[in-house]
Amino acid sequence: MNILISNDHAGTELKKEIVEYIKAKGHSVKNYGDDSGESVDYPDFIHPLAKQVSENNEQTGIIICGSGNGVSMVANKYNGVRAAICWNKELASLSRQHNNANILSLPARFLSSEEAIEIVDVFLTTDFEGGRHEIR
């Protein structure tokens, strides 16, 4: 699986740990995010990722900022993008099962790296249930 990932300055360190985890699981990662940790304008880093997901509905993304809100709002402006802010494993599972989320939005200031990696793992391994959720 090829995972797209992006972040602002608040998510730089968490992103590095997530990228390391994803690669260790045998997936490839394309980084659209900030690597400097210097203050940046998050839309500049989220638009390219969201555009890619919008153009390829088989694509999966992870976006990270301090709260998860700003990056999610930018991503969800694109047709076909379903970005979900998740701060626990249950939300990650439901976002995939019931909402077919294709982008995981993480609040870096509210998660440990261990919690974030558990959420990423659930998001990447949970399938959409379809059925009654398909019509939404």
Regions found by a protein language model. Give the residues of each.
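Glycine-rich phosphate/diphosphate-binding loop of Rossmann-like nucleotide-binding domains
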Residues: L4-A24
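C-terminal binding/interaction regions
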Residues: L4-S6, A10-G11, K89-I135
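Short amphipathic alpha-helical segments
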Residues: K16-V19, M73-K77, Q97, I117
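A short beta-strand-loop structural module common to alpha/beta enzyme folds
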Residues: S28-S39
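Structural motif
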Residues: E38-H47
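Helix-adjacent hinge/juxtasegments
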Residues: P48-I85
